[in-house]
Amino acid sequence: MAKSMTSNARKKDTREKIELGGLIVKAGLRYEKRALLLGLLVDGGRRLKGDEEERSRLTAIGAEAFGHDDE
């Protein structure tokens, strides 16, 4: 039973990582260096702290990008 739960947790973790990688591709950043990608994410995380306006702005950009899924 414990092995099954561990396996399910690992599958869930793997699926989440694949989905997050898909976001990098969708953003057009597939061929950027890992250090640059991590830097973007770290910087974004810092800018989001306590800044609801920035959070809303970036959420709108992401929602628009997801809206173009059928193109």
Curated annotation (Swiss-Prot):
Pfam families attached to this UniProt entry: TraD
Keywords assigned by UniProt, alphabetized: Conjugation, Plasmid
Family the UniProt entry places it in: Belongs to the TraD family.
Full protein name: Conjugal transfer protein TraD
Provenance organism: Agrobacterium fabrum (strain C58 / ATCC 33970) (Agrobacterium tumefaciens (strain C58))
